[in-house]
Design a protein with these regions (language model features):
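Conserved core of the PLP fold type I
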Residues: 145-280, 290-308, 379, 460, ...
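Short glycine/serine/threonine/alanine-rich loop segments
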Residues: 51, 68, 223, 247, ...
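AMP-binding (ANL) adenylation modules
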Residues: 440-444
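Conserved core segment of the aminotransferase class I/II
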Residues: 307-377
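N-terminal basic, amphipathic alpha-helical segments
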Residues: 1-143, 341, 345-352, 360-363, ...
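Short strand-turn motif at the edge of the Rossmann-like AdoMet-binding core
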Residues: 73, 255, 287-289, 317
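Hydrophobic residues in well-ordered beta-strands that form the structural core
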Residues: 206, 227, 283-285, 359, ...
Length: 482
């Protein structure tokens, strides 16, 4: 059976897990996988098909939901095409809605899990140098709020956010207060925007490669994802995509981009805005890394250059202070803010008030900008330290790396013939994690790429992390020539 699946599997199909579901479902229907037979372990099938284990897990989960497979802890996964006998334990997966199964990719959850696993050195998590968090200033801010506004801190709050924080953001970033909506993290903002703006079948033009959380949110809304090569930033290509697909929106992360670390030049920013105005397409600008420059500030944001109210601006305190804050914000036309607030209140009536009020005080007192100055210097040092470690510990010619001027990430390309997903399996077994490039593409691509976060480990752990990664790369190259 496995050889039959291998022959029929086409790696250019999208989504890959859906293609695999179809092949396995057909094999069950034809009797090639009879009821009661065991399907290959997830890792084995992933290796044979040269795809990520996540893809196989997603396919198996969907087949479980359809009642065709059944997993047993410690025994494996089995075909159960025939009706299950009376007394069989109830299977909840068969009750999951089809729409939920569209978003079965667990890569984001895996990244967070790896970052909290004490056995792993995680170069995967997208987080700032949280050991530099301004603990004393934050403690003072929280104490002040609890002393002076305890009812506001612990009671219900407006869905749009605490007025104090909306005003502080409006003053610092130069936007009207009524245009600001507070979020429980920028990822919530992407989910809300997808729910608010995207109907099933709508096209969304986005960075390629681009933020995997955006890929997941727009795909879950039923969007057709169309990639624009953010590294080439060819404006003619973008115009062709706008003409051909008539997208509902453009999503871009133009400053210290996730995952590449690249920054869109000022001329390209103006040209993107011109095209958006010409074709009447709104832009979602993900600006979560814009404050994280090393030395020189980046070009003005699309929002700052926008003269036509086309840009929805998304930002976050989680990426510049700590992910545990779960605090982000949107700035947009008040009509969009009102609609998003209506959607937000159904799932999250308000973002925690205490954190909002504390951050508002940090901004007003100047502690927020002082923290930014500290981590800009720290991030520049850690980026240089990682580059130096790669030069020392990774075999020459095995890894080509970008050189960002801000943000959190190094975007790397493996030598020809090497697989980032296969390397990730080796790395996890050796105690180090990263993100394979396939997670950042809306189409089958990126298996030669990987993203490393240079701020997610302490400086004292950097050399060990890269040494382990370098050893895995060396082993993988030896396997190529064996």
């Amino acid at each position: 059976m496995l050889s039959s699946i291998e022959r029929q599997f086409v790696r250019t199909e999208r989504p890959l897990y859906g293609h695999l579901v179809t092949l396995l479902e057909n094999a069950i229907a034809r009797g090639e996988l009879p009821s009661g037979s065991r399907v290959p372990p997830e890792r084995t099938l992933a290796q044979r098909l040269r795809i990520s284990r996540t893809t196989v897990v997603s396919a198996y989960r969907e087949l479980e939901a359809r009642g065709l497979l059944r997993g047993y802890v410690g025994r494996g996964t089995f075909v159960c095409a025939a009706p299950e006998p009376e007394g069989t334990p109830f299977a909840w997966r068969g009750k999951i809605a089809a729409a939920a199964l569209r978003s079965s990719d667990s890569t984001l959850r895996d990244i967070v899990r790896h970052s909290s696993d004490a056995r792993l050195l995680s170069l995967a998590a997208g987080e700032p140098a949280i050991d530099k968090f301004p603990n004393e200033a934050f403690h003072e801010a929280v104490s002040h709020v609890l002393r002076t506004e305890p009812l506001a801190a612990w009671g219900h709050g407006p869905t749009e956010g605490q007025p104090a924080l909306r005003e502080a953001i409006a003053d610092r970033y130069g936007v009207p207060r009524e245009s600001v909506l507070i979020l429980s993290g920028a990822q919530q903002g992407l989910d809300l925007l997808a729910r608010c703006l995207v109907d099933p079948g709508d096209a969304v033009v986005m960075d390629r490669p681009g933020y995997l959380g955006a890929i997941q949110s727009f795909r879950a809304a039923g969007a057709k994802l169309v990639g624009w090569d953010i590294l080439r930033a060819d404006i003619d290509e973008l115009e062709d995509l706008l003409v051909r697909y008539r997208p509902k929106l453009i999503y871009t992360n133009p400053t210290f981009q996730n995952p590449t670390g690249s920054t869109l030049p000022i001329r390209a920013r103006r040209e993107v805005l011109t095209l958006a105005q010409r074709y009447r397409v709104p832009i979602v600008e993900d600006a979560t890394y814009g404050d994280l420059y090393f030395t020189d500030p980046p070009p003005p944001s699309l929002r700052e250059l926008d003269d036509h109210n086309l840009v929805i601006y998304l930002n976050s305190f989680s990426k510049v202070m700590a992910p545990g804050l779960r605090l982000g914000w949107i700035a947009a036309a008040p009509s969009i803010v009102d609609q998003i607030a209506i959607i937000k209140q159904r799932m999250d009536p308000h973002t925690p008030n205490l954190v909002q009020l504390a951050i508002a005080r940090l901004i007003r007192q100047g502690a927020f900008d002082a923290h930014l100055r500290t981590i800009r210097l720290e991030h520049a040092k850690r980026c240089a330290q990682m580059v130096s470690a790669i030069q020392r510990y990774v075999p020459r010619g095995s890894l080509r790396i970008g050189r960002p001027s801000g943000g959190l990430y190094l975007w790397c390309r493996l030598a020809p013939g090497m697989s980032a997903n296969a390397l990730l399996d080796r790395a996890l077994a050796s105690g180090v994690a990263f993100v394979a490039g396939t997670a950042f593409y809306p189409d089958p691509a990126g298996d030669s790429d990987l993203r490393l976060c240079f701020t997610s480990v302490l400086p004292s752990q950097m050399d060990e992390s890269i040494r382990k990664l370098g050893a895995c790369i060396a082993d993988a190259r030896l396997s190529q020539t064996a």
